[in-house]
Swiss-Prot record:
Reaction(s) the record says it catalyses: RX + glutathione = an S-substituted glutathione + a halide anion + H(+)
The protein's enzyme class: transferase
Tissue: Mostly associated with vascular tissues, especially near hydathodes.
Protein name (record): Glutathione S-transferase U20
Residue ranges of every copy of the GST C-terminal domain listed in the record: 88-208
CDD domains per the UniProt record, alphabetical: GST_C_Tau, GST_N_Tau
Key words, A-Z: Cytoplasm, Detoxification, Growth regulation, Nucleus, Transferase
Molecular functions per Gene Ontology: enzyme binding; glutathione binding; glutathione transferase activity
Domain (GST N-terminal) ranges: 3-82
Organism (species): Arabidopsis thaliana
Function, as annotated: Exhibits glutathione-dependent thiol transferase activities. Can use glutathione (GSH) and 1-chloro-2,4-dinitrobenzene (CDNB) as substrates. Involved in the regulation of far-red light influence on development. Regulator of the interplay between light and JA signaling by increasing JAR1/FIN219 efficiency. Maybe involved in gravitropic signal transduction.
Family: Belongs to the GST superfamily. Tau family.
Activity regulation, per record: Activated by JAR1/FIN219.
Amino acid sequence: MANLPILLDYWPSMFGMRARVALREKGVEFEYREEDFSNKSPLLLQSNPIHKKIPVLVHNGKPVCESLNVVQYVDEAWPEKNPFFPSDPYGRAQARFWADFVDKKFTDAQFKVWGKKGEEQEAGKKEFIEAVKILESELGDKPYFGGDSFGYVDISLITFSSWFQAYEKFGNFSIESESPKLIAWAKRCMEKESVSKSLPDSEKIVAYAAEYRKNNL
């Protein structure tokens, strides 16, 4: 496995899952290395000295950090199969815009839903539902955010679906009631082997979130 790309990751991380999905969508074999956040590996600290976070993709001895950056790198490093971006500049710009929306609006809100309580949780739930509705509107009647093909925005968002059950359990609401098209989209994405092999079982995520809440709230 010496010549394979190395992915430094942590199993429940929706950001790490993005890298897994991207690599598998391209058919790239890689070495998966699980990180222990209480004892980060020398390779992680050396590869990402600024943020010291996963995911990090080490390819040809060079580290690529930050999940969306990793996804874009994978698309450019292995261009032969399943392009993640449209061919036109406007389409690519729109894809980057919506992936950025997921990172800036969706990420913070979803954490408040499962990782907070009281007023902060309720505020997060409101933000989450608003973000979900905006994303559903952008999806429209398309099979994927990229149109007919699974792409960059889909990869940026689908990994959160492994957490949907945890959001519903701890936030006490139904995502499908709020956004049926988004749930249908998530099920469509899960039919792809690159996605189904990369996302952990939702019950494991619920147990992980419950343990976090027990220890931190």
